[in-house]
């Protein structure tokens, strides 16, 4: 991870099995998410707990912050689940998947992508109807001690943020978010990807193995919010 650069991360249940059975399980996870995120210097901007996976939008202060957060939170929730349901073994599917996110249009798209998960899954008609995401905090102002608003969100403002949900996310952008997250790439313009590749010393977009060439790269024009 790159300190100060937002991350969209997803952690799935092992074999895509449920990792939350009821609201008590979800409340336990969220309580410790807030505590451990503070411990590991990760700012939580958005989240959504689905039945068999979790989405988080984070900004780590240190390179190891996200990995330590997921390791500690995953272990704690596994121990809790195994005790409560008298089971054994792993709960989660290996390492979490993630992408680096450029702090502009792409970041706000990830906010919405995360908070619209229950709508896409057909669980609710409106994101505000789902209790286990950050939508009510980010769009409606409900107090949530886990949430640290990103500067990009603050510059937009809550009312304008809420209006974004009146439009669908572009399907191509949805696919890009999924692909970059599953592939461990970077989500953003070409200049952002070059900076991330230089910092990490590895490729952060699809292509042949090895460090990407800087020759011929061009900055792409950012899509408009509205």
Describe the residue ranges of each PLM region.
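Short Pro-Cys-Gly-centered "Cys-loop" motif that presents a nucleophilic cysteine in a tight turn
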Residues: 1-50, 59-226
